[in-house]
Amino acid sequence: MAFVWLLGALVLIQNVLGLERTVVTTLSEGIRYSRLVTLLILVGPAEEVIFHGVIQRSLEDVIDVWAAILIGGLLFGVAHIDPAAMGGGNLFFYAAQGGFGVIVGWIYARSNNLVIPALVHGLFVAITTALPLVFG
């Protein structure tokens, strides 16, 4: 039950602070790259701690590891939903986020080390953030 509250708190914090929108706004304005770097360094590791270090690990105590990975990935995708941007291609984005959550959940289950999925997450965010900058 605690992980449900934690997930709700994460979604609320992300939406209230506008963390994902901040990255897009920062890029479109072409300023505050130090703020962008800070987001890239902090958001990925923080999400890994919450979704895999807390939620997935807690679920593994009561259900099968694969079920915990799949539920954790689903919750990861749900946490990235922006109700204001629902519909169209955004649904694919949310499904991809869930799939990414499953992949890094599997990496965590295999390695039993949060640093590895946090690095993968940070690299993924860095690449997907840099591509629009490079290819406009």
What are these regions (language model features)?
Residues 20-30, 59-60, 89-104:
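Short, motif-level signal for alpha-helix interfacial/capping segments enriched in acidic residues
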Residues 69, 79, 83-85, 89-136:
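Functionally important transmembrane alpha-helices
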Residues 33, 37-38, 66-70, 90:
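The feature captures the transmembrane alpha-helix scaffold of multi-pass secondary transporters
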Residues 3, 35, 48, 65, ...:
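Transmembrane alpha-helical core positions of polytopic small-molecule transporters
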Residues 46-71, 109-113:
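Membrane-interface helix/loop boundary segments of multi-pass membrane proteins
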Residues 45-50, 54-59, 78, 82, ...:
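Active-site His/Glu-centered metal-binding helix of metallohydrolases
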Residues 1-46, 61:
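Juxtamembrane helix-loop-helix connectors linking adjacent transmembrane helices
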Residues 72-76:
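Alpha-helical transmembrane segments of helical membrane proteins, especially in multi-pass transport
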